[in-house]
Amino acid sequence: MPVSGLWFEQLEVGLRVQHATTRTVTETDNVLFTTMTMNPQPLHLDAEFAARSQYGQVLVNSMFTVALVVGLAVPELTLGTTVANLGFSRVDFPAPVFIGDTIHVVTDVIEARRSRSRPGTGIVTFEHRGINQRDETVCLAVRAAMMQCRPDPGRPDPGRPDPGRPDPGRPGPGSPEPERS
């Protein structure tokens, strides 16, 4: 798996990332997530019920929203460099998400320290903000993650090919030709 995330040393307090990927939420997203998580809330599933609510339409499941917000942050921030998600200290939904809303994410690094118990790792606290096309914040999530430190120069990076080591799936020089049938 390629590593495009940032190493612990690159995740300095004050770093702000405006993530490139956006996502328009579909009815299918909402129905699948809501039913897979066994949440029968009619605000998420019943258009007639939701039409009579203060919102006048179906609300997207808020747990889908937080999952989407964190997921949209992965490619530029943590892909291949996260050891573990440690938890959320805050999750707020200041505005609802509706079918057809397009979400983009801005992430700030608000804390970073080396792990005291796991050498080669650090603990980073991220503040992710999901923002819709009307520039309304729809989700604010503060989470801590254990992140890999940059590997030693003498060791290959995890997830990146080591040019000095043959790929076990490909024959190298002097290897017998594979049998052909």
Task: Tell me the role of every PLM-derived stretch.
Residues S89-V91:
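Conserved interaction-surface patches within small, structured recognition/assembly domains
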Residues M1-G87, C139, D152-G159, E177-S181:
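Hot-dog-fold acyl-thioester-processing enzymes
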